[in-house]
Amino acid sequence: MIDTTAPLSLLEALVLGIVQGLTEFLPISSTAHLRVVPALLGWDDPGVSVTAAIQLGSVAAVIAYFRRDLTQVLTGISRAVRHGQWRDPDARLGVAMVIGTLPILVLGLGIKFFWHAGYASSPLRSVPSIAIVSIVMALFLAMAECMGPRLKQLGGVTGRDGFVVGLAQALAVIPGVSRSGSTLTASLFDGWNRADAARFSFLLGIPAISIAGLVELKSALSTSAGAGPLPLLVGIFSAAVVSWLAIDWLLRFLQRNSTWIFVGYRLVFGAGLLVWWAFKSAN
């Protein structure tokens, strides 16, 4: 059941879609911003179901952007199944994506079916929790930026790489962690170059975000306080357009630059939230 108290307006859906598109693939946590931006604007929390459904726009964008990569992965897996060519780079990438999806799939479905109501109202979704998590993850990203050797490339990905990065992806069920941030951090710690780390993060997110969005879409549409089809379509469409632009920008950016700008942003974001929350609580 969706955890909002009022239907979503078209303006709210548009803003949430833009926020989703900007933050899903940047290592700054879309879940945190989708929780915090409505709070700052005085809107109701859109809830787990609506935010997950709007993520389908990001799924459409990443599938469209990486359509050639995905076609090659499917072709590689097909060759491996038919001819046993499991050392093929495209087949290995497909296997890594499957293995990397399992941790968040198990954890996410467990939360959905056994702790959904508790998770939706959990202290993990509170502003101070999101702020603290954002600061902690910024520090981990900073350490990864300093320590990683930057030698691994996507063509050499293994099932072990998929599992390691997949475990990091599972941490994204905690608001403020950032799915792209946790996977990028784990990849950098594991020795990937920045651009390929981001590319694998995007590809790995396709199954996880797709499943989460489809599972929650019915709930977002079916409850009396839900968003309704038109606002959801507005949110999904705006998320798709902005996500495409964000993916393209980040891949180009990381070919020439480090992730320090995101470390700084997350530190300022987290500290600013704590100050805002303290001021609001005092009044």
Swiss-Prot record:
Q: What is this protein called?
A: Undecaprenyl-diphosphatase
Please give one Pfam family short name: BacA
Further information in the entry reads: Bacitracin is thought to be involved in the inhibition of peptidoglycan synthesis by sequestering undecaprenyl diphosphate, thereby reducing the pool of lipid carrier available.
> Per the UniProt record, which residue ranges are transmembrane?
46-66, 95-115, 127-147, 154-174, 200-220, 227-247, 259-279
Top-rank taxon, per record: Bacteria
Which reaction(s) does the protein catalyse, per the Swiss-Prot or TrEMBL entry? di-trans,octa-cis-undecaprenyl diphosphate + H2O = di-trans,octa-cis-undecaprenyl phosphate + phosphate + H(+)
Membrane-protein topology: Multi-pass membrane protein
PANTHER family named among the record's database cross-references:
UNDECAPRENYL-DIPHOSPHATASE
Q: Provide the protein's localization.
A: Cell inner membrane
What's in the keyword line of the UniProt record? Answer: Antibiotic resistance, Cell inner membrane, Cell membrane, Cell shape, Cell wall biogenesis/degradation, Hydrolase, Membrane, Peptidoglycan synthesis, Transmembrane, Transmembrane helix
